[in-house]
From Swiss-Prot:
This is Collagen alpha-1(XXI) chain. Keywords: Collagen, Cytoplasm, Extracellular matrix, Repeat, Secreted, Signal. It is found in: Secreted, Extracellular space, Extracellular matrix; Cytoplasm. Residues 535-556, 733-744 have a biased composition (Basic and acidic residues). One of its GO terms (cellular component) is extracellular region. It comes from the Eukaryota. It comes from Xenopus laevis.
Length: 957
């Protein structure tokens, strides 16, 4: 059973291919015939102006004229936007370029603010979302000012829905960053800028080429850091399935395919080029061959086998030929015979590159420009035949050669980026990768290795540039209604307008205001012959407007220009009302809006306005009897003609659909209810008034008194439809930012001043008893003084130490620290985080700090309080005065009483004698009387007590 299903499916597939081939046999596929949905999103804000908007419409007509219009081809939609978007032309509404052009020319300029994001969202929801064709979707956004709403996120949503966005900015007020946010990437392909609307015609051809690339070249080829639209013909012809032998290419790291007579590189053209070829492209091939005959490197055949496009080489004459289509003769061939071509036949590796445009073709060999030749106009190709590589002319036999690359790039600019670096002996860096068919890839495209360890933290960067302006804030609240702008020059006849409302019985009066929407200028100048001649055959014929030969029908045409009947059936669009007369409505929500379709009446009675339409326009009479002629393009406003004679009252038009509720207007007091009046005589039609805001439909009532004119507003000069909003509410304070990373170590600061002396440290532990020192040299003999006890002397030293030791230590520390070499201390442990401080204003990034100096060596702790001195040993007995020469050591004598101070001369110091034997401890003597105040050297006492220098390391001595 599965086998039967497989066979049936195969039969159906084969039949479907033949069906497609036969169906497309008479259709030349090209950019013109490619099916896609194309939507223009046009800026209709005040900054554009009516004249520039006319230029914009002509530009749209010129762009769309390059495509076949219809369900099988391109479908065009148009959205105009200002404060709100309006669906001017739905997708698929027209099936001919003439009808589409006429409808495009009839679009009326809106005026208002710039809400670009809202318009893009409107196109997504109301055009692309309703299209049932799974085709290329393209939107072109044209604007001349900064959007007053968010465009970035809405544009991202469009791209998620596979909508390609082009952005075209006009004038000096445009922001490049906003255009880049709207358009696809790269911006060099999808963003355009011109200085004014006159210059927009300069990008018409390049815009046509880009649109063709989107519809004809859907595939992408990875080249360097970007993807180029184009065709990899080797892959398209299934080279990997043909069992072609892989060999070494132009360089050792490149790989190529060896094509032999046993390998047939043939494929159905519809599978390789489903929409034909673009109007301009770059053909490139890297190859090596030894063939001495004529052969086709690449060719596209029609169903009958005739060549439509081909690149051929002639080994006998050493020439290269390019064949393509032609409108007159079907095909045209260009042969390059210059000496630069002959190097192709030296049996070495070479690169052939052809830059094909709509006007000419240029040959490059190994990146050297050889010659440029003119081309006749080219037409599309039949895709029902075959595409082949490496074939002899008019034969199916394959040629033996080696092929490394065969591609077509749809963007002509790729010709400037392409190099021949893969050819030995040429200069240039290979940015496109080493090969098209495999081998060792360049380092830049190798698969990533394992993630390495984090590197050291880099230095702080320089302060960043100021950030880009933030997104526009939310719309402000509606302000008080501005004063009504001063009426235009022809505003005086508007007084008779209320009589017209009375004739339509109240609510239908709003329909009349709907008829005034669009304000196309004075209708009398529609179709000046000069302007229509400039428009040419692109839909600017203005058939009826030019000749004015239809008499009464001409009058009817003038009336139709005011009514714009084609736009009345679109619900939700905002009309522009004239100067309000007796409103007849309650008026609680502002001026009544224009939801109706008054324009269908034709408004007879103003035949004098057209002026140039001939003498028949002087009398309205029975203008409804004839069929209205085709509408000509809107002409530029001119001097108003004389006021025509009132015609008979026309029939009451049908009531239009209710329009959307407009922004609330300033409330006005309700008029006094009057008696219902009889139908009044229709007055002369007033000139188009200043556009007002459409309010919600009020309760039906009788005619009231005319409301008072409002106060003059800030933007009332042209009756802007939008109410100026108040400044937006200040945004809430942002959330506190995250704690930043730890900064680098700061610059080493200068050495600080010595700090104040710290508190005396806690007493240290008692030191161990030191070894007994050697006996010092005897000092000079002093005068005999009063004998003092050891305890008394010790107490004096302790008192002196307590009084003077702190200052001595402090001075000693300062001296030692000023002389010692600062050593680098180890960094301390980070302290605990401090409490969160109040949020400060965000500062600019600081400059990177330098490394700080090493900290000072910490002060050593103060010495502990000296331990209690042991009891002194028993002093030895004083010996007798020795002679000059030392005598024998005598035995210790008994201490005698203190004698009077003797007056003697110091003797010479004798040699050091042997240490004496410690004498027996004698009984303590009696306390003597207090002696005179002596002078105790604190340093001696300090040394005696401490037995060492506390700032010196080493043994005690």
């Amino acid at each position: 059973m599965p086998g039967i299903i497989y066979i049936l499916c195969s039969i159906l597939l084969i039949e479907s291919q033949y069906y497609v081939a036969s169906e497309n046999a008479e259709i030349r596929s090209s950019c013109r015939t490619a099916p896609n949905d194309l939507v223009f999103i046009l800026d209709g804000s005040w900054s554009v102006g009516p004249e520039n908007f006319e230029i914009l419409k002509k530009w749209v007509v010129n762009i769309t004229s390059n495509f076949n219009i219809g369900p099988k081809f391109t479908q065009v939609g148009v959205v105009q936007y200002s404060d709100y978007p309006i669906l001017e032309i739905p997708l698929g509404s027209y099936e001919s370029i003439d009808d589409l052009s006429r409808r495009t020319q009839s679009i009326q300029y809106l005026g208002g603010n710039t809400q670009t994001g809202n318009a893009i969202q409107f196109a997504i929801d109301n055009l692309f979302a309703r299209s049932l064709r799974p085709l290329t979707k393209i939107a072109i956004v044209l604007t001349d000012g900064k959007s007053q709403d968010d465009v970035k996120h809405i544009a991202e949503e469009a791209r998620k829905n596979k909508i390609t966005l082009f952005a075209i900015g006009v004038g000096s007020e445009i922001e490049e960053s906003e255009l880049r946010a709207i358009a696809n990437k790269p911006s060099s392909t999808y963003v355009f800028y011109v200085e004014d609307y006159i210059a927009i015609s300069r990008i018409r051809e390049i815009m046509k080429q880009k649109l063709c690339e989107e519809s004809v070249c859907p595939t992408r080829i990875p080249v360097a850091a970007r993807d180029e639209k184009g065709f990899d013909i080797l892959l398209g012809l299934g080279i990997n399935k043909k069992k072609a032998k892989r060999v070494e290419g132009s360089r050792p790291r490149n790989k190529a395919y060896e094509i032999t007579s046993q390998i047939d590189l043939t494929e159905f053209t519809g599978n390789v080029f489903p929409e034909g070829l673009p109007p301009s492209y770059v053909f490139i091939s890297t190859l090596r061959f030894k063939i001495k005959k004529k052969w086709d490197l690449w060719r596209i055949l029609a169903l009958d086998g005739t060549i439509q496009t081909a690149v051929s080489l002639n080994g006998e004459e050493k020439t290269l030929s390019f064949t393509t289509t032609n409108e007159e003769n079907g095909t045209q061939a260009i042969t390059f015979t210059t000496p630069g071509v002959k190097k192709l036949f030296d049996e070495e590796w070479h690169q052939i590159r052809l830059l094909v445009t709509e006007e000419d073709i240029t040959l490059y060999v190994d990146d050297q420009e050889i010659e440029t030749r003119k081309l006749l106009p080219v037409i599309g190709i039949y895709i029902s035949g075959q595409t082949q590589i490496g074939k002899y002319p008019a034969r199916e036999e394959s040629v033996q050669f080696t092929l490394q690359k065969l591609r077509i790039y749809c963007d002509p600019e790729q010709n400037k980026r392409e190099t021949a670096c893969e050819i030995p002996g040429t200069n240039g860096e290979c940015l496109n990768g080493p090969s098209d068919v495999g081998g060792t890839p360049a380092p830049c495209i190798c698969p990533p290795g394992e993630k390495g360890d984090p590197g050291p933290k880099g230095d702080s960067g320089q302060p960043g540039n100021p950030g880009s302006p933030g997104q526009p804030g939310p719309d402000g609240k509606h302000g008080f209604q501005g004063t009504s702008g001063s009426p235009g020059i022809p505003g005086s006849p508007g007084v008779q307008g209320p009589r017209g409302f009375a004739g339509l019985k109240g609510n239908t009066g709003q329909d009349g205001e709907k008829g005034d929407r669009g304000m196309p200028g004075f209708p009398g100048l529609h179709g000046q012959p000069g302007i229509k001649g400039e428009m040419g055959p692109k839909g600017d014929k203005g058939d009826i407007g030019i000749d004015g030969k239809k008499g009464t029908k001409g009058d009817k045409g003038g009336n139709g220009a005011t009514g714009k009947p084609g736009r009345h059936g679109e619900p939700g669009s905002y009309g522009k009302d004239g100067i309000p007369g007796y409103p007849g409505q309650k008026g609680e929500e502002g001026k009544p809006g224009p939801p109706g379709m008054e324009g269908l009446r034709g408004l007879p009675g103003i035949p004098g306005i057209p002026g140039n339409d001939g003498a028949n326009g002087l009398k309205g009479e029975t203008g409804l009897s004839g069929e209205p002629g085709a509408r000509g393009p809107t002409g530029t406003p001119g001097i108003s003609g004389p006021e025509g004679i009132s015609g008979p009252q026309g029939p009451v038009g049908p009531k239009g659909n209710k329009g959307e509720t407009g922004p609330p207007g300033k409330a006005s007091p309700a008029g006094m209810k009057g008696e219902k009046g009889e139908m009044g005589i229709p007055g002369q039609q007033g000139y188009t008034g200043i556009p007002g805001l459409m309010g919600p439909k009020g309760d039906k009532g009788n005619l009231g008194e005319r409301g008072m004119q409002g106060h003059k507003g800030e933007h009332g000069s042209s009756g802007m439809p939008g109410l100026k909003g108040e400044h937006g509410v200040t945004g809430s304070k942002g959330e506190k930012g995250e704690i930043g990373e730890h900064g680098h170590r700061g610059i080493t600061g200068p050495r600080g001043e010595p700090g104040n002396m710290g508190l005396i440290g806690a007493p240290g532990p008692r030191g161990m008893s030191g070894e007994r020192g050697t006996q010092g040299l005897p000092g000079p003999k002093g005068q005999q003084g009063k004998e003092q006890s050891e305890a008394f002397i010790r107490q004096i030293c302790l008192d002196v130490l307590k009084a003077q030791l702190p200052s001595l230590i402090q001075n000693d520390i300062r001296q030692n620290c000023n002389q010692c070499k600062t050593q680098e201390g180890s960094p301390g442990l980070p302290g605990p985080p401090g409490p969160v401080g109040p949020e400060g204003t965000r500062g600019h990034p600081g400059l990177p700090g330098r490394n700080g100096f090493s900290g000072l060596v910490g002060q050593p702790g103060l010495p502990g309080i000296p331990g209690t001195k042991g009891l002194p040993g028993k002093p030895g007995a004083k010996g007798n005065k020795g002679d000059i020469e030392p005598g024998p050591q005598g035995s210790p004598g008994v201490p005698g009483p203190a004698g009077l101070p003797g007056v003697g001369k110091d003797g010479r110091t004798g040699p050091l004698g042997p240490p004496g034997r410690e004498g027996d401890r004698g009984p303590p003597g009696t306390q003597g009387p207090p002696g005179d105040a002596g002078i105790c050297d604190p340093s001696l006492c300090y040394g005696a007590v401490m037995r060492r220098d506390p700032f010196r390391k080493g043994p005690n001595y």
